């Protein structure tokens, strides 16, 4: 999710005011790899530049602490050992995103800022807090989060040269949204992520009149083994990233070193329009590339010579990744588009195409390489309170699985040096259900490699006075898989204090939080739900019912009947040390009062989960 509703439509009246800069020379000694930056979450915002030999290496806004930092951010200076770099700061008044200047009386841009925060900056062989990173009190242990700063949309998901790449929207210099870079992590198993340096930076020399400058917004990445682009060099088929450069348009970046660093394509921008978030993939039947990109629908012609409809996903094609032709659009969607094909489970040789947006709204239909045909009404992929957002699926997976990662929007971590997390990777399947074809996620099979201290019960009868209970470590991340045979009573599965209720009388489940979440204060420009709304799911008529849950610190993800219902939410309740299946005393069927009701637990597995993070 982004602050700018229309990425490339900038109000001419918008003026960003800067003050007199204050500069400091910092000599980077041999062995020093990080420039440590003190952060105060309540500090004043200044604009900073880090320079070498007169050229800006990065430019960002930051709340420099003048004393007693809340935490420390860092900038990698490995390449500048034995050299001097300069850091300068200046007072800064950010633009009001409605177009009016947000002048505040406490900021006077005509004077230089205090240099107290600048004087606390230092270079070292470690970043501040490195010895305790990944072991912080509230760090999720099986969900990816950055070492420092804010993260949101997953970007550029691609398998390349033996690694799964996870790029993501990242503010490396603050706990709130802003300074959009592409952060970068890699894993060989989709679990054990190694965070690397920032991969894509804002372009620093963009200064059009009235512009907010540049940010590296969301996009995707592909491999071009047929060299349709002509980008191959020295036998290397590069990683090619597509992203929205907010000051330019849709742009290409090229990497020849396994996605670690990127160079700018000289023909950028490849597309200028009122939109963002290009997802690119190869369409083999047509022997061409496809880009699905969100269009805001402002009354302006695309440079391709076609008119965009209101809030549509536009489909463009290209023979070479560089020249694009508008083909069609599907209206009613908002940002972060996806388009992919999936086989229909249980129907050999039958497949359908799925188009979805950031909110998890999707349609199933057909695609001929140029036009998407809607085959059934819009459905909602995530059924929770909006904590699942901006998901993307992997290109080029070696086993053809459709692997998805979403952003756990507004799952905040107050008091920590990081903020937000990615949701657990899932495999998507297309299933025939009571209401037609449904997109169904389940945790990737690799989760089993994290299991420890596993417990299993089978064929247990649950009655109103005899629940089935398993004790667990409430501080550990856990994975629960429970299968029930329908009885004559409603049943509750309590996972560390989070209640999941199934009412068999009406043959539907109500998955609800029972006093587990408190209202939260949004960090950045996002408004999270302040209450948890029960989720209703009509079951398919079978006598078996399955609930799967992953609980990790303040994150809980629920999968019902192998993903026929899915949702993620914030878990702020007081945790218990148990997983318990019990019969509810009210509602449901089974006759009158005084009759002992029962339910059958066919199988209930509870696994504690090993951390995905390395030990320091």
Per-region residue spans from a language model:
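Hydrophobic core segments of beta-strands in well-ordered, beta-rich domains
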Residues: 37, 87-88, 153-173, 177, ...
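Conserved Ser/Thr-centered positions that define the repeating blades of beta-propeller domains
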Residues: 51, 187, 253-256, 315-318, ...
């Amino acid at each position: 999710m982004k602050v700018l509703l229309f990425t490339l439509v900038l109000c001419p009246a918008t003026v960003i005011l800067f003050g007199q800069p204050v500069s400091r020379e910092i000599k980077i000694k041999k062995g020093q790899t990080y420039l440590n930056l003190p952060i105060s979450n309540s500090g004043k915002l200044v604009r900073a530049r880090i320079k070498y030999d007169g050229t800006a290496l990065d430019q960002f806004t930051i709340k420099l602490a003048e004393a007693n930092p809340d935490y420390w951010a860092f900038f990698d200076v490995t390449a500048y050992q034995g050299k001097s770099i300069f850091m300068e700061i200046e007072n800064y008044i950010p633009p009001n995103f409605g177009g009016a200047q947000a002048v505040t009386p406490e900021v006077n841009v005509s004077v230089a800022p205090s240099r107290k925060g600048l004087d606390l900056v230092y270079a070292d062989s470690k970043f501040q807090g490195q010895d305790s990173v990944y072991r912080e009190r509230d760090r999720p242990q099986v969900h990816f989060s950055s070492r420092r700063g804010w993260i949101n949309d997953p970007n550029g998901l691609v398998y390349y040269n033996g690694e799964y790449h996870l790029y993501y929207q990242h503010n490396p210099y603050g706990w709130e949204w802003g300074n959009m870079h592409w952060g970068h992590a890699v894993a060989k198993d989709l679990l054990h992520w190694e965070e690397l340096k920032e991969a894509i930076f804002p372009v620093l020399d963009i200064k059009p009149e009235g512009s907010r400058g540049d940010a590296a917004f969301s996009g995707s990445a592909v491999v071009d083994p047929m060299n349709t682009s002509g980008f191959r060099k020295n036998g290397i088929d590069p990683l090619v990233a597509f992203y929205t450069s907010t000051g330019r348009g849709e742009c290409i970046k090229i990497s020849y070193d396994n996605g670690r660093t990127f160079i700018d394509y000289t023909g950028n921008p490849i597309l200028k329009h009122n939109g963002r978030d290009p997802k690119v993939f190869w369409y083999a039947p047509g022997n061409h590339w496809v880009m699905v990109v969100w269009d805001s629908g402002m009354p302006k012609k695309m440079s391709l010579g076609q008119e965009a409809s209101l809030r549509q996903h536009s489909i463009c094609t290209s023979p070479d990744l560089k020249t694009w032709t508008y083909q069609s659009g599907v209206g009613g969607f908002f940002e972060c588009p996806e388009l992919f094909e999936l086989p229909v489970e249980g129907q050999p040789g039958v497949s359908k195409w799925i188009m979805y947006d950031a909110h998890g709204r999707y349609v199933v239909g057909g695609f001929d390489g140029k036009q998407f045909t809607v085959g059934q009404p819009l459905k909602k992929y995530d059924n929770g309170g909006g904590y699942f957002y901006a998901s993307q699926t992997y290109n080029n997976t070696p086993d053809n699985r459709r692997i998805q990662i979403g952003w756990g929007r507004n799952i905040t971590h107050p008091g920590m040096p990081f903020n937000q997390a990615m949701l657990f990777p899932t495999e998507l399947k297309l299933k025939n259900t009571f209401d037609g074809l449904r997109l169904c996620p389940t945790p990737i099979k690799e989760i089993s490699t994290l299991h420890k201290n596993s417990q299993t019960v089978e064929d247990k009868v649950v009655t109103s006075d005899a629940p089935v209970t398993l004790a667990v470590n409430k501080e550990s991340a856990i994975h629960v898989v429970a299968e029930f045979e329908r009885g004559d009573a409603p049943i509750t599965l309590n996972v560390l204090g989070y209640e999941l209720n199934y009412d068999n009388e009406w043959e539907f489940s109500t998955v609800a939080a029972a006093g587990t979440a408190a209202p939260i204060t949004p960090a950045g420009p996002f408004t999270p739900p302040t209450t948890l709304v029960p989720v209703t799911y009509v079951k398919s008529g079978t006598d078996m019912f399955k609930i799967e849950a992953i609980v990790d610190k303040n994150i809980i993800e629920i999968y019902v009947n192998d993903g026929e219902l899915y949702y993620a939410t914030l878990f702020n309740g007081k945790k218990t040390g148990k997983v318990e299946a019990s019969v509810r005393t009210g509602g449901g069927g089974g006759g009158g009062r005084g009759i002992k009701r029962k339910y059958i637990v066919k199988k209930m597995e509870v696994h504690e989960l090993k951390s995905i993070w390395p030990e320091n």
